[in-house]
């Protein structure tokens, strides 16, 4: 299928499934706009995209998505340079062994895995509307099935563990996707989320503690980044899912999210709480 003339914004596009998704979409003719933290990896990835897929003017913007000001600034930068965005892939994510808070007072996992996609999507909303029909795809995880929403402790000040923080952030991701789709109904912008499965990537390498070792073992049995990116690429490009929205996918199959994640009251309350924390009306 062709993505000629389409612009795709991708976070976490310099490694792993994000990079594989960027390459696959570029091969279809899409123009890739990356959001990256590391300038060295960003420039290397951009150079490779331009060399392998010269038909489009690929670009990269730099931001530390742990910082609220950076989230808002990079969204504004992209909105200022892109008249339309056909696909937004919120793919960047991490797990951290120890609880640390950002300059804004957010626990890091919550900031990167939930607040950043929320802020970036909000900041790019007019460009997505301008491209309608457009798509938002959020990378989530099956571990959300093990989480309960704790609106009274979004900053995870009580009983922090890396596992708890991660699964809670993935629950937030599913809830955000569902509420986004509800609020944007009629805008011709779909919103879906996907668990790509276990993939052999760099995920967890810099998390600290025993997390790198744990993921190293898991990655021995994981699929390749290219294969892991397939469900994301499908949601971004396939006409088969063009009309689907507010859905959760396990790999390439439509699946049921947890009852906690399908609770509309949870989704609405989380949206309002996140908007308040992020200073978004």
Residues covered by each model-derived region:
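Rossmann-fold NAD(P)H-dependent dehydrogenase/reductase core
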Residues: 1-202, 277-281
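A short, mixed-charge helix-start or loop-turn motif at secondary-structure junctions
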Residues: 11, 158, 162, 214-218, ...
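Short acidic-hydrophobic sequence patches enriched in Asp/Glu that either
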Residues: 41, 209-210, 220, 266
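C-terminal helical subdomain
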Residues: 71, 169, 193, 215-256, ...
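Short, flexible, mixed-charge acidic loops at enzyme active sites
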Residues: 149-154, 206-210, 248-249
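Hydrophobic alpha-helix feature that most strongly marks membrane-spanning transmembrane helices
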Residues: 185, 208, 237-240
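A glycine/serine/threonine-rich, flexible loop-to-helix segment
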Residues: 200-216
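Short glycine/threonine-rich loop-to-helix capping motif typified by GTGT followed
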Residues: 205, 260-261
């Amino acid at each position: 299928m062709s993505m000629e003339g389409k612009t795709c914004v991708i976070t976490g596009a310099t490694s792993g499934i994000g990079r594989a998704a960027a390459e696959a979409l570029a091969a279809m003719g899409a123009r890739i706009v990356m959001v990256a933290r590391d300038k060295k990896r960003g420039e290397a990835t951009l150079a490779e995209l331009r060399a392998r897929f010269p038909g489009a003017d690929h670009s990269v913007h730099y931001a530390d998505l742990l910082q609220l000001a950076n989230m808002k600034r990079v969204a504004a930068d992209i909105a200022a340079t892109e008249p339309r965005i056909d696909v937004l892939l919120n793919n960047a994510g991490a797990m951290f062994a120890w609880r640390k808070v950002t300059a804004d007072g957010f626990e890091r996992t919550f900031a990167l895995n939930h607040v950043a996609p929320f802020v970036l999507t909000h900041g790019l909303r007019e460009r997505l509307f301008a491209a309608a029909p457009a798509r938002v795809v959020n990378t989530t995880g099956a571990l959300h099935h093990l989480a309960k929403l704790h609106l009274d402790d979004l900053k995870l000040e009580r009983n922090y563990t890396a596992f708890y923080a991660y699964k809670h952030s993935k629950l937030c991701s599913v809830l955000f996707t569902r509420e986004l789709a509800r609020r944007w109904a009629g805008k011709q912008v779909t919103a879906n989320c996907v668990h790509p499965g276990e993939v052999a990537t760099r995920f967890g390498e810099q998390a600290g503690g025993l997390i790198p070792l744990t993921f190293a073992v898991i990655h021995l049995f994981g699929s390749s980044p290219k294969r892991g990116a397939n469900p994301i690429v499908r949601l971004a490009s396939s006409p088969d899912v063009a009309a689907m929205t507010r859905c959760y996918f396990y790999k390439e199959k439509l699946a049921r999210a947890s009852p906690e994640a399908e609770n509309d009251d949870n989704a609405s309350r989380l949206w309002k709480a996140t908007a308040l924390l992020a200073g978004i009306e």
